[in-house]
């Protein structure tokens, strides 16, 4: 009988494995450096910068209305959130109160965007897991949401719905559009129910992702994690509960406790019905009146800040207004603070789970790459 020789600690060599900048499981280009010992990740480093477009710098000196339109280009998934928050900055600084009907339409657009983002998350996560059927199913359900966004905003990616004082008249909701939205929500509700029954309740799938990429609650708070990734650790924090725009709507804040891939997946599955609930309330109680107030006047303002809750967490916009133009624009997206969680989640897990640990945080590196500071040029 041959005695098995156990390797000494000195025999284990740390290996660096690089993934990216282009990788089959990545929706966007970014680089991941994994430092591995015996196929277990000991350290992870995510490098961004490939998607840099300098949007904040381009906004400098532009007329406020034009700069607001440019913010849509920050992110193709959360385009509505960016222009909405940028418009909110101007409205807060200029003291503009928009018509309630316009606010309801903005909420409908934002929750539709949250739906399509969460379905994209489920589709991408299923693909990384190797379940192509579930991935295609999520994309199929998402298509209903995309068509509703196209119907209201005129495009499937960038809608340009929000403007200073309300929403564009072309985004007005008539009876036909309201009926289409109601029917669409019925279809999406049926779709997510079937998806959950077949995917979330599958013991093979759940056993594959349970206990993987764990982010403890204390660590999540320390890393300043935001959005569903933070709520997946048990922290009951959703900025929508503090936003006056959401005061007319009744919905629940979803939380999970384990902070692993399973908890993050369940977060999105369970948040989808809440968004459907908000949209149904909005179309049922849609106020009458105008969708835009054009009686406002432009004047100089010091730096104004605005925070809103978007599909990935807290989005921050700020700028000052001088002679009707934007000054000192700053945008902070949720993925900027969540990068630390993505790196932490990889540590201690097998190398084959590394990309899954990153995907669970729903990264969007394109919106994170907005500005670049060059030191000692």
Regions found by a protein language model. Give the residues of each.
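Active-site bordering "gate/hinge" segments
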Residues: 1-377
